[in-house]
């Protein structure tokens, strides 16, 4: 495959990881001021699930891309 495409995939994974973490930080702050604490907890639980699944996936993709690009250098 194309090295440029592979690089784009790695960049996308890294950006997705950062976006998930940044969005969760905002959620953690904003749920503290919510009156509906049960709903706030539902949002926090969902955020934790998404972080658990997708941050590790993004790391795996990024690591695999880095390894492949380094081998081709």
Enumerate the predicted regions with their spans.
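A structural signal for small-residue-enriched, beta-sheet-centric alpha/beta enzyme cores
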Residues: 1-73
């Amino acid at each position: 495959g194309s090295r440029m495409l592979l690089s784009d995939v790695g960049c996308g994974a890294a950006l997705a990881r950062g976006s998930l973490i940044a969005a969760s930080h905002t959620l953690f702050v904003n749920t503290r001021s919510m009156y509906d604490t049960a709903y706030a907890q539902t949002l926090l639980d969902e955020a934790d699930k998404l972080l658990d699944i997708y941050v590790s996936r993004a790391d795996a993709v990024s690591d695999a891309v880095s390894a492949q690009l380094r081998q081709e250098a």
